[in-house]
Amino acid sequence: MKLRSRLTSALAILLATVSLASTPACGLHSEAPPAASAPAKASPAYADAARPKIEASLAETLAPGAVVWVHAPRLGDWAEAFGARTYRGDDKLTVDDHVRIGSNTKTMTGTVVLQLVEEGKLRLDDPVSKYRPDVKDHAITIAHLLSMRSGLYNYSESLEVNRALDEDPGRAWQPEELIAIGLSRPALFAPGAAYAYSNTNTVLLGRIVEQITGRPLADEMKARIFDKLDLTRTALPSISDASIPSPHPRGYQFGTNVDTIESMALSPDAQARARAGTLLPHDATTMNPSWGWAAGAAISTAPELGRYARALATGELLGSAMHEQRLASVTPNEPSNPETALYGLGIGKLGPMFGHTGELPGFNTFMGHDPVQDVTLIVWTPLDAAPDGKPPAIEIAKIVLGELYAGGAR
């Protein structure tokens, strides 16, 4: 099952890749802007350097394509689609194709929750049991859910959910079903004692939003985020809707959800067959994403996700005090090791960028914005994981960030 704790490993990869860029004194390697007479389609130098590496990465991960979208005023913007919409096909991807954004949805749910906190409709230190009597541990707070420090079991790691996804991919999951599975298992640790990525946390938050507002979470996201940012192609679909708006690619997955509960990597034999072309990925495009709901079911496009990522990281959707509190909450998942991944109130820190990653059957996404350098990066692929378990979009994001911040300490 994808949409699990990929974020943690992705953050670690990116921290190592762009560690030089994490200090404000390290500016982007600047270059002269293109002359007015330069060809309109000329790409920035960092894009020219990244392009062949991206193509090599796609060949390595077996992803059929990718979309890269960069807003970098000092170095030049770049938007490019690589590859095809279908596996071994000829229908070319475009930058404007729709994509399932997976766990990037968590930042949207988190933003709505923080807006409700600003409005005085709930508090970060409220016990979750105030709204959900089925959460028996009264020490678990709203903040614990947002920061992945509740200790609640992640329902999407259960054999029950993974087997159901393999046997009935079109099933429409009710949020309460997912919560019940998450709460049926013992807690992993005492609230606040550690970090553990769990979709149960975010689905609970989604239901609490609906309880407080009396409206569907999708409507709250639209009114509070999408409409405010003029995101007309971004939505949280209804639980019965497994479609993706056109245009869109097919989304692919190697292996089954049950096979990948413990590890994203296939067996050595299966990896060899995939690379030999005798084991093909299966089409997961219309797998109903309702099993992710508030934690991972949203759909968007690269340009709109880029617009949202910047608003998320700069505080456009929150008051200044709440935004500062949110960014300050982003701390190492292992306090004794500051080099580990960082996570806070519904937001992660990916190298110099605030944002998130997303992964669910068929799709892998990276979303980040660096508010110091005013750089936004969106990457997505229509393959969730390579046969060896590597996340294709994260591998490409690593390449692009490396080129963007090359020489950053000079």
Segments predicted by a language model, with ranges:
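Short, conserved catalytic-motif segment at the N-terminal edge
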Residues: 44-99, 121-123
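Bacterial N-terminal signal peptides
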Residues: 11-23
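Bacterial signal peptide processing site
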Residues: 27-29
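Short, surface-exposed loop or secondary-structure junction motifs
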Residues: 139-353
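Short, gly/Ser/Thr-rich active-site loops of penicillin-recognizing serine hydrolases
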Residues: 331, 340, 386-410
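Short, Gly/Ser/Thr-enriched beta-strand-loop segments that form substrate-interacting elements
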Residues: 83, 334-371, 378-381, 387
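Short active-site loop at a secondary-structure junction
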Residues: 61-65, 88-145, 189-198, 293, ...
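Bacterial N-terminal signal peptides that target proteins for export
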Residues: 2-14
